[in-house]
């Protein structure tokens, strides 16, 4: 397994560093660092601060993903998933969560609220053409293979 170094800056004295929770985990858990409890009403969304900023190396991105346990047990997930952290972003990581559940969801400082996966980035060079190669699928879109 390849490793890279990512610089982390604590923006708040109580900020917790992302952490892998098992030896082969692909994602590091991200921790909430609000000033106090944050209550997210059913159907509502909010941004939860993490208290950290990252310097992701050029050639990589951070993908912020939901935690499956929060989705299963509370109906809480991320609004934009995966969220992308570019290599040139240096601000605080904020996690935009939404409560699809039926009850208030309370986020407390130190709660694990999302996962961070580091992935390589490949930049595309676009080539304008008059025609595209034919495929068996061609323009078949949403649900074209059945439900």
Swiss-Prot record:
Its cofactor is Mg(2+). GO terms for molecular function: dUTP diphosphatase activity; magnesium ion binding. Substrate binds at residues 67-69, 80, 84-86. It holds the Pfam family dUTPase. Its EC number is 3.6.1.23. InterPro entries: dUTPase (IPR008181), dUTPase-like (IPR029054), dUTPase-like_sf (IPR036157), dUTPase_trimeric (IPR033704). The keyword Flavoprotein does not apply. Coiled coil: none annotated. It is an enzyme of class 3 (hydrolase). SUPFAM superfamilies: dUTPase-like. Gene3D superfamilies: 2.70.40.10. GO terms for biological process: dUMP biosynthetic process; dUTP catabolic process. Keywords: Hydrolase, Magnesium, Metal-binding, Nucleotide metabolism. It catalyses: dUTP + H2O = dUMP + diphosphate + H(+). This enzyme is involved in nucleotide metabolism: it produces dUMP, the immediate precursor of thymidine nucleotides and it decreases the intracellular concentration of dUTP so that uracil cannot be incorporated into DNA. Belongs to the dUTPase family. This is Deoxyuridine 5'-triphosphate nucleotidohydrolase.
